[in-house]
Structures are given as C-alpha cells and as structure tokens.
C-alpha cells in the first residue's frame, strides 16, 4: 500500500509540474491571434513595384555602423561602408527593436507577418511548423526567397498558395560551425544571380519576375553562424559583415540594371542580434537591437539635423547629424506592405513608420488610417469572442471614454476638412490616428488577458494544494508510518463535486481551452485529499516537531523563511547564494561537531563552492581550467581507490582504474579538439570519434560492467557514479564547469560524513529531535538543488549555455542532439545530488525517499513565488528573467521527482558498510 501511495505521488507530481510549467504561457503569454478579419489594403498608389528584404541573421546594430578595429589586420574602419554611405546619402535608418525570445523564428515572423508570436513559439521548430497566420509574403504577387532551410519553409509551406513563394535552400550540412560562414551567404547571392540569368532565356520567368508586387527575400545566415562559432568580435564575424556589404552594393547595381526603372525598394535589417558570448535568445540589448536601413522607391532620404543627437550607444557611429528613426520589429511588415501596395497582413500589429515614407502628408494619412483600421478589425473580432464567452462583459476603459467609432468619425471629419484645403490639420489627423492605433493595441492586450484573475486563482490553489498534499503524504508515510487509505466522506464528495461542476461550467461558458480544465483538476484533487486527511496532518505535524520548544520553533521558522527568501533573491543576484553557502560553512560547529580537520575542510570546500556563483555564468572557453579540473578528478579518484582498496574486489578495482583512464583519455581528446578549433583548423576526426567513444563507453558499458558484479559499499558506488559522468562533464565544459563538478562532489561527500557524525552525537545524547536534523538536511538539500544549476548556469539569459563545448562532438548545426548534450550537462549535478540524498537516507537510518519527499513538498514555494513575479511589461531582459526563473523553479521540483527514482536505482542494495564489504563483490 505504501508503494502505491508513493507511485501515485510521483505520477501526479510529474503530471502536475509538466502541466503547470506550461500554465504561464496560457495565462501570461497567450497569443492574441484571431481569424475572420476583413483585410485592409495599405494604399491604392504604391510607390514601389517590387521590394528586396535583406536579413543579416544575427547581425548587431553597433557592428553594422561602428568603426571597428579588425583583430587580424589591426586596421580601424567601418565594416559596412556601402550601407553606411546609403545612411548618409540615400536612406532612412534606425534601430529595429526586437522582442524576446530573440530567436530566428519569432524574429522573422515579427518582421514578415507583423505579429509577435507568444514566447512558446520558440519551441515549435521551423520547417516542421510553418506559420499559421497571414504574412507579407502571402499578400505579394510572388515571393522569391533564398537562404536557410530553417527559415524559408515556414513561409513557403505556410502561404495560402505554396506556389506563390519559391525557395532556394542549401542543405543542413552547410551549417558547419567549424567552416567558413561566408559560403552560406555566397549561396544566396549566387542563386539570385542565376535566377536573373535564367530569365534571359525563359520569357515566362522573365515576365513573372518583372510583374508588380513581387518580393525578394534574402536570408543571410553567415553572421549568426560566425557569431555562434567564434563570437561577434571575431575576425570571422567581421569578415562576414564586410562580405555582406560588398554583395549588397553589387546587388543594388544588378537590380538597377536588370529592371531599369528605379522602382525597387530595399529593406536591410536583422532578425536578432548577438551577445558578446555568441548566443542569443534573451532580452539583452545586444540581442534586441538590430540595424534597419531602407532606401529606394517610396522611401525617404536622410534628414540632416542642425543640432547633432548623441547617446552612449551610438556615439561611435559618427552619424549624430543624421536623424535616427527607431521602430519595433513588427513595424517592418507594415512598411513593406505600404511600399508595394499589398494588404496589411491580417494579424499584423505593426505601426506604419511614417518617418521612412516619402510622400505627402495626405498619402501618409491614408496609409496610416488603413493601418489603424486593420488593427481595429482585430480588436472587434477579439472583443466579440470575449463578449460571447462572458456572463458579464466590461468594455476596455479607454474605449468606454471614447469609442472606436468616435475616433474614426473624428479622423474622417479632419480628412474632409483637409480635402477642402485645410492642410494644416494633417498633423492633427495623423496624431489622432496614431493614438487610435496605440489605444487599440492596448485594448487587444486587455482582451487577451481578460480572464487572468480567474485562471490565476485556480493555478494558485493548485500550487498550494500540491505543497500541502505532498507534505501530507510525507507525514503519512515517513513520520506516522501510516499506509492505510482514508476514504472521503459523503460531505467531502458532495462539496468538491459541486464545486467542480460549477467551475467547469464557468470554463465551458468562457470557451476556455482544454488546458484550463486540466489546471482545475489538480486543485480539486489535492484539496479533496487534504480535507479527508486533516487528522493525519495534525498528528504528523505534532510527531515531526516533537521535542522542539516554541522558541526553537520560531528560530527554525525564521531560518527557513530567510533561506527561502535568499534563494528567491539569489535567482536575480547569484552572489546571495554565495553568502548562504558561506553561512552553511559553520553549521557543523553549531551542531556540536568539534573535530578541527573536519570543520576546516568543510569551511574550505564551502568557500570553494561559493566562488562559482560569483563567477560570470556566461563563459569564455578556457582550456587550462578544463585541464586542471581533469587532473583533480583523476587524482581524487585514484586517491579514493587507494583508500577503498581494502573494501573492493580486484574486479571492481580494475573497472575503476579503467574509468580513471577514460577520464584521462577524454581530457586528451578535449584538449586536442579545443586547440584545433581555436586555430580554425576544424574538428579533428580522431578527436571527435574518440570523444564520442569515451562518452558512450562511460555512460553505458562501464555502468553495465559494474552491474554484473556490484559493490554495495556506498562510498564505492558514489565513486563509480562520479567517474561515470566525469568524462561527459569534461568534454562539455567551456571553462570552470568541470572544477565545479569536482568541488560539488567533494561537498556532497563531506556533507554525508558530517550529518552522520551529528546523528551519532545526538544518539549518544539521546536527543529526541530527529525532526530537526531531517528538516535541516532537507533545506540544505533543497539549496544544493539550486546550486546544481547556478554553479554553472544563469537564468539572466536563457541562452547562457554556449555551444562551444558541443562543437567538440557535433560541428554541424543540429539543434536536437546539441540540446540533448546540453541537457545532459545540466542534469548531471542533479543526479549526483539525488544519489547523495539517497545515501543520506542510509546514513541517517531512515526510509528511502524520506529526504527527497520532504524537499519535494516544499520546493514549489519557489514556483509560486515566481508565478506572481512574472512580468509581461518592461524591458525584455526583465521579462525573460522572470520566465526563466519560473521554469527553473518548477523544473527543479520535476527533476527531484524523476531523479529520486534514478538515484534509487543507482543506489540499489547499497549499505553503510565500509570495512566489512567482502572483496568477492
């Protein structure tokens, strides 16, 4: 019966955490996507016949315009002189501000569809998930696209007529991070050139290319690839920018010669930027600021300023005398639609940037009004959806003060006056139209979040219910040893059945998605069980805290609150975690451990471990640190084998020696790979094969050989696990991570011995406060759960895990295997901790899963904290941090649920024996 209860807890816990992990995307980041709108044409008099959209994937704004010293030639110059000359003489320019996640799919969707996908869109992939809403390409006469197979199929396969979009793509094998990235962009220009040449012998193709309303999309992946491989301050990245600039210059001349009409509009921009460490995804300004340069038919020339405008970011651009016009990334879709006179994309929320448009105020006003009405149409459709799903509907307050009809009436009255000669009213009409757009966009957000309060209440009761339910199971199984099933009373069944029916009807009436019903199931289940077991909770709490005075209870309570709050703040400021670790350095003394060597070694290890949360989580490759860590792992393992030689058989000694040899071998192959890649000589085949061979042998064959003749000494088992994962951690380390692995393991080993000593001390004193030790171990274990991540990672950037280490195994871009390797690196410290907690159960002579069950019951206090700390407004860096915090908090709980099972299997039949272990094992 006890096993059934444990199994139920684990299954329910895994399902609960997986589902509630997604709840923030259903509540805070739901897509305002609606269908059934009447589309609005941008203008009846398009200024351009065709448009070229040139996207430098991963190109930063500052790199485009700054004067930069090339790391090889040492020459200081502008990397893009032609684009710069356009800014100075022919173009309007600015910064296009992207939103998070700063990834390729959301960035391209924003600029081409004018629509910000919800944050979860980054998980959809690319080719397999074409965009499921209207786009600028969908509205063109025909689109010719060239570039990456990760981007082009989204819009080709997602078009209303796939034949409307042609795509020329290279194979995935081109995306080799160890080769020149320029070839990726050369492919694009080469195939565009071939298209023009083919048209000279194909009249039908020539006619199609020359028709009005066409778009040409050039996706240039080179900068992104070079940035990931060598960083955005590398010669490779700079050379790629130089190459793009030269090719754009050739392209402009080629287009002018081919069409010969000067009716082509050009847009040059990027989908996202690149961090200093070669990553993107988060809301750091280096990732969200991209260049936007627009020139050609229908586009303004530069506006020169009498008084130069300076700011810290652009001061080195030397463009202070030219007006900079910043836009939101979605505004680009509206601009492109206007330039060739297509409909605004149905779901576009982009605002037409008037500063970029050449033309009269009247023409601008017409296009802007159509833009506003297109967005207003989305609001009306969304409002009808909400009205039809509410018992009572409260109109958006700003539209209650002044309705959309009143706005439109006022604008159209101004237009009539303008047509009658009162041209001075044009700025007022434009201002009012822009105000209507702004209020409409705010109204869309209001409608999208209309049911927030109700569903957030359900989720809150779900978290509180899980905390109480899991703590109740802990008390029942491990404190009271009560495995009997308590059946709910008729009153309990009646109350929760009635409540469930009422809440389900509300969800049904509101036309809620299926997930909302699933969110409701959990709080109903949890609280039904809690109210059926109030006696167990009361008796369990009394037993758990037996022998603890009121004063001690207050001190313990304040300590727990302080640690939990410290952990919450530690998610934002990692140095706080270092302070907590240093404070833990003295707890053995407080608990009565007097051995000087034990205390000194523990203090040194605590200080050493605390240093990792002071280091920059975004790392620069450092082979020396990897080598030092590898040597320490080899020496510590050899020392451990010598110390345990009396307790292990020759068979086990040989296996452990082989594992130490594998660690040395992995260190050798890692060193060869790093040196070769740093010299730009590519990944040596022997190092790649050797790395994979040791990785597979360490993780599969060696554990199997140990399984054939297992040694049940807990120290030997922990050493075996330590050596099993060491090669993986070495090859996946960028700098100090392997050092963390060494010290983190040492910390766990010492912690086990200290708690064992404290238990012996308390048993000698016949102390009746085992609950305090259990609570202390659970709190430290929970804290180490956070250190398992923060020792090498950081939630200030969801992209803080650089791909440098993965190139040593996978030089060609392949997101899923690369992601799997990074996840392996992330999970390994959790596995070590889970094994440590399992051994702690044995050391303290308590039942399996006792400590992890107590940790699981309290860990979601963090999840609930971060659920309410989530931000949907403000800087994208802040928003990204809050999302990452919540995900990490809830995944930590999920990891403990899953990994305690893994840990239990890894520690099967382990005993406390250290000297009685027979060598025949």
Curated annotation (Swiss-Prot):
<dbReference type="GO" id="GO:0071555">
    <property type="term" value="P:cell wall organization"/>
</dbReference>
<feature type="topological domain" description="Lumenal">
    <location>
        <begin position="676"/>
        <end position="684"/>
    </location>
</feature>
<feature type="transmembrane region" description="Helical">
    <location>
        <begin position="600"/>
        <end position="620"/>
    </location>
</feature>
<dbReference type="GO" id="GO:0006506">
    <property type="term" value="P:GPI anchor biosynthetic process"/>
</dbReference>
<feature type="topological domain" description="Lumenal">
    <location>
        <begin position="31"/>
        <end position="457"/>
    </location>
</feature>
<feature type="glycosylation site" description="N-linked (GlcNAc...) asparagine">
    <location>
        <position position="90"/>
    </location>
</feature>
<dbReference type="InterPro" id="IPR002591">
    <property type="entry name" value="Phosphodiest/P_Trfase"/>
</dbReference>
<dbReference type="InterPro" id="IPR017850">
    <property type="entry name" value="Alkaline_phosphatase_core_sf"/>
</dbReference>
<feature type="topological domain" description="Lumenal">
    <location>
        <begin position="900"/>
        <end position="921"/>
    </location>
</feature>
<comment type="function">
    <text>Ethanolamine phosphate transferase involved in glycosylphosphatidylinositol-anchor biosynthesis. Transfers ethanolamine phosphate to the first alpha-1,4-linked mannose of the glycosylphosphatidylinositol precursor of GPI-anchor.</text>
</comment>
<feature type="transmembrane region" description="Helical">
    <location>
        <begin position="850"/>
        <end position="870"/>
    </location>
</feature>
<dbReference type="GO" id="GO:0009277">
    <property type="term" value="C:fungal-type cell wall"/>
</dbReference>
<feature type="topological domain" description="Cytoplasmic">
    <location>
        <begin position="706"/>
        <end position="728"/>
    </location>
</feature>
<feature type="transmembrane region" description="Helical">
    <location>
        <begin position="778"/>
        <end position="798"/>
    </location>
</feature>
<feature type="topological domain" description="Cytoplasmic">
    <location>
        <begin position="538"/>
        <end position="552"/>
    </location>
</feature>
<feature type="transmembrane region" description="Helical">
    <location>
        <begin position="458"/>
        <end position="478"/>
    </location>
</feature>
<feature type="topological domain" description="Lumenal">
    <location>
        <begin position="750"/>
        <end position="777"/>
    </location>
</feature>
<dbReference type="InterPro" id="IPR017852">
    <property type="entry name" value="GPI_EtnP_transferase_1_C"/>
</dbReference>
<feature type="glycosylation site" description="N-linked (GlcNAc...) asparagine">
    <location>
        <position position="286"/>
    </location>
</feature>
<keyword id="KW-0808">Transferase</keyword>
<keyword id="KW-0337">GPI-anchor biosynthesis</keyword>
<feature type="topological domain" description="Lumenal">
    <location>
        <position position="621"/>
    </location>
</feature>
<dbReference type="GO" id="GO:0051377">
    <property type="term" value="F:mannose-ethanolamine phosphotransferase activity"/>
</dbReference>
<feature type="transmembrane region" description="Helical">
    <location>
        <begin position="820"/>
        <end position="840"/>
    </location>
</feature>
<feature type="transmembrane region" description="Helical">
    <location>
        <begin position="729"/>
        <end position="749"/>
    </location>
</feature>
<feature type="topological domain" description="Cytoplasmic">
    <location>
        <begin position="643"/>
        <end position="654"/>
    </location>
</feature>
<feature type="transmembrane region" description="Helical">
    <location>
        <begin position="517"/>
        <end position="537"/>
    </location>
</feature>
<feature type="transmembrane region" description="Helical">
    <location>
        <begin position="622"/>
        <end position="642"/>
    </location>
</feature>
<protein>
    <recommendedName>
        <fullName>GPI ethanolamine phosphate transferase 1</fullName>
        <ecNumber>2.-.-.-</ecNumber>
    </recommendedName>
</protein>
<feature type="topological domain" description="Cytoplasmic">
    <location>
        <begin position="479"/>
        <end position="488"/>
    </location>
</feature>
<feature type="transmembrane region" description="Helical">
    <location>
        <begin position="685"/>
        <end position="705"/>
    </location>
</feature>
<comment type="pathway">
    <text>Glycolipid biosynthesis; glycosylphosphatidylinositol-anchor biosynthesis.</text>
</comment>
<keyword id="KW-0256">Endoplasmic reticulum</keyword>
<keyword id="KW-0472">Membrane</keyword>
<feature type="transmembrane region" description="Helical">
    <location>
        <begin position="489"/>
        <end position="509"/>
    </location>
</feature>
<feature type="topological domain" description="Lumenal">
    <location>
        <begin position="574"/>
        <end position="575"/>
    </location>
</feature>
<feature type="glycosylation site" description="N-linked (GlcNAc...) asparagine">
    <location>
        <position position="909"/>
    </location>
</feature>
<feature type="topological domain" description="Cytoplasmic">
    <location>
        <begin position="1"/>
        <end position="9"/>
    </location>
</feature>
<dbReference type="InterPro" id="IPR037671">
    <property type="entry name" value="PIGN_N"/>
</dbReference>
<feature type="transmembrane region" description="Helical">
    <location>
        <begin position="10"/>
        <end position="30"/>
    </location>
</feature>
<keyword id="KW-1133">Transmembrane helix</keyword>
<feature type="transmembrane region" description="Helical">
    <location>
        <begin position="576"/>
        <end position="596"/>
    </location>
</feature>
């Amino acid at each position: 019966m006890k096993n059934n209860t444990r199994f139920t807890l684990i299954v329910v816990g895994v399902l609960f955490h997986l589902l509630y992990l997604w709840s923030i995307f259903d509540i805070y980041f739901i897509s305002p996507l609606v269908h059934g709108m009447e589309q609005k044409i941008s203008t009846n008099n398009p200024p351009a016949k065709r448009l070229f959209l040139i996207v430098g994937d991963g190109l930063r704004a500052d790199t485009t315009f700054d004067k930069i010293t090339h790391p090889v030639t040492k020459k200081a110059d502008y990397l893009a002189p032609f684009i710069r000359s356009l800014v100075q003489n022919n173009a309007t320019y600015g910064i296009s501000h992207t939103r998070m996640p700063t990834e390729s799919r959301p960035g391209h969707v924003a600029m081409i569809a004018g629509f910000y996908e919800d944050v979860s869109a980054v998980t959809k992939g690319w080719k397999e998930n074409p965009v499921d809403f209207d786009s600028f390409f969908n509205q063109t006469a025909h689109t010719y696209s060239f570039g990456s197979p990760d981007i082009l199929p989204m819009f080709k396969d997602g078009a209303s007529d796939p034949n409307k979009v042609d795509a020329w793509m290279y194979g995935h094998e081109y995306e080799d991070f160890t080769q020149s990235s320029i070839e990726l962009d050369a492919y694009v220009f080469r195939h565009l050139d071939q298209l023009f040449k083919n048209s000279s012998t194909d009249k039908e193709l020539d006619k199609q290319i020359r028709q009005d309303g066409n778009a040409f999309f050039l996706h240039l992946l080179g900068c992104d690839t070079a940035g990931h491989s060598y960083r955005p301050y590398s010669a490779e990245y700079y050379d790629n920018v130089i190459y793009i600039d030269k090719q754009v210059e050739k392209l402009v001349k080629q287009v002018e010669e081919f069409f010969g009409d000067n009716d082509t509009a050009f847009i040059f921009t990027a989908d996202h930027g690149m961090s200093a460490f070669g990553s993107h995804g988060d809301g750091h300004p280096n990732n969200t600021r991209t260049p936007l340069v627009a020139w050609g038919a229908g586009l303004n020339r530069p506006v020169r300023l009498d008084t130069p405008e300076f700011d810290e970011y652009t001061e080195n651009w030397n463009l202070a005398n030219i007006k900079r016009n910043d836009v939101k990334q979605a505004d680009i879709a509206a601009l492109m639609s206007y330039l060739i006179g297509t409909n605004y994309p149905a779901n576009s929320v982009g605002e037409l940037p008037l500063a970029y448009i050449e033309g009269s105020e009247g023409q601008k006003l017409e296009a802007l009004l159509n833009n506003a009405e297109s967005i207003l149409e989305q609001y009306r459709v969304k409002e009808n959806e909400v009205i039809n799903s509410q018992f009572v509907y409260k109109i958006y307050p700003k539209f209650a003060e002044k309705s959309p009809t009143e706005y439109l009436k006022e604008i159209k009255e101004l237009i009539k006056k303008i047509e009658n000669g009162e041209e001075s009213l044009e700025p007022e009409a434009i201002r009012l139209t822009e105000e209507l757009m702004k209020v409409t966009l705010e109204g869309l957000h209001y409608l999208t979040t209309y049911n927030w309060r109700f569903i957030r209440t359900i989720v809150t009761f779900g978290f509180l219910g899980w905390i109480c339910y899991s703590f109740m199971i802990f008390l029942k199984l491990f404190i009271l040893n009560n495995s009997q099933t308590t059946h709910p009373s008729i009153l309990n069944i009646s109350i929760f059945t009635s409540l469930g029916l009422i809440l389900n009807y509300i969800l049904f009436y509101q036309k809620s998605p299926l997930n909302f019903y699933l969110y409701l199931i959990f709080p109903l289940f949890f609280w039904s069980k809690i109210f059926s077991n109030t006696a167990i909770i009361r008796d369990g709490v009394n037993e758990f805290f037996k022998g603890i005075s009121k004063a001690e209870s207050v001190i313990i309570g304040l300590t727990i609150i302080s640690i939990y709050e410290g952990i919450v703040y530690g998610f934002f400021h990692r140095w706080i975690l270092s302070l907590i670790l240093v404070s833990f350095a003295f707890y053995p003394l407080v608990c009565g451990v007097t051995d000087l060597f034990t205390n000194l070694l523990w203090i040194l290890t605590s200080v050493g471990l605390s240093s990792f949360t002071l280091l920059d989580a975004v790392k620069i490759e450092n082979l020396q640190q990897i080598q030092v860590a590898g040597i320490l792992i080899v020496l510590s393992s050899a020392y451990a084998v010598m110390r345990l030689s009396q307790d292990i058989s020759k068979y086990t000694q040989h296996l452990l020696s082989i594992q130490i040899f594998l660690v040395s071998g992995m260190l050798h192959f890692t060193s060869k790979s790093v040196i070769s890649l740093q010299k730009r000589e590519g990944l040596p085949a022997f190092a790649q094969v050797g790395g994979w061979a040791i990785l597979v042998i360490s993780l599969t064959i060696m554990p199997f050989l140990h399984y054939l003749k297992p040694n049940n000494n807990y120290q030997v088992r922990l050493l075996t696990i330590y050596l099993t994962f060491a090669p993986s951690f070495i090859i996946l380390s960028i700098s100090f991570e392997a050092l963390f692995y060494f010290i983190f393991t040492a910390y766990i080993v010492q912690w086990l011995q200290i708690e064992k000593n404290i238990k012996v001390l308390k048993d000698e004193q016949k102390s009746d406060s085992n609950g305090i030790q259990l609570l202390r171990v659970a709190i430290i274990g929970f804290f180490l759960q956070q250190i398992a991540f923060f020792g090498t990672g950081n939630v200030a950037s969801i992209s803080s895990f650089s791909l440098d280490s993965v190139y040593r195994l996978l030089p060609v871009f392949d997101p899923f295997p690369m992601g799997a390797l990074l996840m392996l690196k992330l999970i390994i410290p959790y596995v070590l901790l889970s094994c440590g907690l399992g051994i702690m159960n044995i050391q303290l002579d308590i039942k399996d899963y006792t400590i992890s069950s107590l940790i699981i019951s309290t860990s979601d206090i963090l999840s609930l904290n971060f659920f309410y700390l989530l931000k949907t407004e403000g800087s994208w860096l802040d928003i990204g941090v809050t999302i990452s915090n919540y995900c990490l908090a809830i995944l930590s709980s999920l990891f403990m649920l899953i990994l305690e099972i893994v840990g239990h299997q890894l520690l099967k039949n382990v005993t406390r024996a250290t000297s009685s272990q027979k060598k025949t094992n």
